[in-house]
């Protein structure tokens, strides 16, 4: 089952992956985080937020139970967002130059700003919306 899911997601990303780019302007926007609790470690350059977390950066919206963000020396963030049973992580972002969005849901989502890659782990769902209409979905 995992092999089949990996194959399906890989095929989908190969087919639609080349033109799927997030808004370039999002890279220069500040990240805003709301959560029940938040802790920042200035020495380690890590932020941990827990409890009804909502993070936004430009057109990026992410909702999770917990988020850990690590910042490298160039200021690029690596984010791990986790959900819980019945409450998966949700992510939505606009595609560059189009009236399209992609939405992702999974038990865990990892996002690397440096490579502009996201990784969906556990019960993953990926959707492409044109306007507000569902165009493609893979589970």
What are these regions (language model features)?
Residues 2, 19-20:
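Intrinsically disordered, low-complexity regions of eukaryotic proteins
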